[in-house]
């Protein structure tokens, strides 16, 4: 359960690593606090003419939200148009890469449903980020592999030869 009352799950039955879900609808599963057997439903995504999603519908961060974030940091700061576009593009690319990696994790555990734990696992392992409001009781701590003595000796030899 998240701060909005229910966690959203995305159906991955039509997802492949090279394609994205249809822009007209996304399957979302609403999960009550205790029950995990709620059926999957379709949620429409706003589209512009021609059946294609508008650029505003695809963006996670709008220009207004970006300006609000900048005002929180420094009320007197103004961003150039190019900087705004670049920050919006970086945010979109980040979300796309996180969702893609989370979908691959869901596929790896042989599930057709993207769950919060998939996104959470990717963010914790790759970006060292935690999602507020979601405990990590299911995710075991990530331990880096111990370096062996043989590896240390090889690395020392490499460093020694590089100094010469």
Swiss-Prot record:
Keywords: Nucleus, Transcription, Transcription regulation. GO terms for cellular component: SAGA complex; transcription factor TFIID complex. It holds the Pfam family TFIID_20kDa. It is found in: Nucleus. Gene3D superfamilies: Histone, subunit A (1.10.20.10). One of its GO terms (biological process) is RNA polymerase II preinitiation complex assembly. Residues 59-131 form the Histone-fold domain. Residues 14-56 are annotated as: Disordered. GO terms for molecular function: DNA binding; protein heterodimerization activity; TBP-class protein binding. Residues 14-25 have a biased composition (Low complexity). The TFIID basal transcription factor complex plays a major role in the initiation of RNA polymerase II (Pol II)-dependent transcription. TFIID recognizes and binds promoters via its subunit tbp, a TATA-box-binding protein, and promotes assembly of the pre-initiation complex (PIC). The TFIID complex consists of tbp and TBP-associated factors (TAFs). Belongs to the TAF12 family. Component of the TFIID basal transcription factor complex, composed of TATA-box-binding protein tbp, and a number of TBP-associated factors (TAFs). Component of the TATA-binding protein-free TAF complex (TFTC), the PCAF histone acetylase complex and the STAGA transcription coactivator-HAT complex. This is Transcription initiation factor TFIID subunit 12.
